[in-house]
Amino acid sequence: MIALKNTIKSIVEKQLKVKVKSVRECGKGASGSVYKVRITSEPFLLAVKSSQFYDNLIKEKNMLDYLSERVSYKVPKTYFLCKENDTAFLAMDFIKGVSGKSKIVRFIPDRKRLKNSIMDALMNAQSVHHNKFGKYDNPVYDTWKEYYKVYFEDIYKFTKRKYDNNEIESVVMEAVELIKTHFDIIFNETSDKACLCHGDFWMPNLIINFWKSELVGAVDPFDMLWAEPEYELFCLTLGFGEKLRLYDEYKKRNKTTAYCDIKVELYALCNELNWYILLGEMEHGYIIYRSERLIKAMRNCLRKC
């Protein structure tokens, strides 16, 4: 830990020609750790992410730069990306506020105001459109169904291979098989407008002004896409977002498709499996939980609809 902090200090001073006053770990995620770095000149505070996944940090930097020009909420300005031995470092603005995963957010003065603030930011991002679907930097598909079918085939093949090797549970395979069987029905109705999706717009990646009960910004975009609006809604159902009833608020404001509830569970599961592909590891208990939720949602909704 001390050696890594010293490395960060040395790199920041070399790259930005400033003096570092302190380095403190302030967060940890699936792909790396984040350090709060105090320096002697503007911007005075930096967030420096360290990771063994250099390619992922390249993608994150590019996504942050792209997103910052197109949304109303704050996105960290990036300063440099470099690699030292086997560790990559991405330096960016430190957005002041409270992480949405902090327990203190449960005691926020005005939950309704916070909910509306988050929803307004999401709706603003969803007002940014493209005439094609797919990766944010190269959308080439005419429909969302066309893009997601190609994406899902990779998820399916990966899951099947893991299942055949006894590396993934049968309930996960069952859920993925259900998606494959009913794919054309579920995706029969989608939006014809591609909107810009952060890809990981859930509470731990949201920065909150506690006393104003407002969203300040968002960090850590993941697999950013031009997608149908419902793609990102699973993020609203996770963690404290569920307590705020963000998904219910979205459905009050917007007309959703007949199978929206299924797609929320489907996207959540496929997102976790995509992380498994990228990182080579997963939390089996959580994947099982997401699979069971999807199976239940599909049985309920397909029976009613």
Task: Please name every model-derived segment.
Residues A3-L16, K115, S127-G199, F210, ...:
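An alpha-helical support segment within catalytic cores of ATP-dependent transferases
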Residues C260-A268:
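Alpha-helical scaffolds flanking conserved acidic
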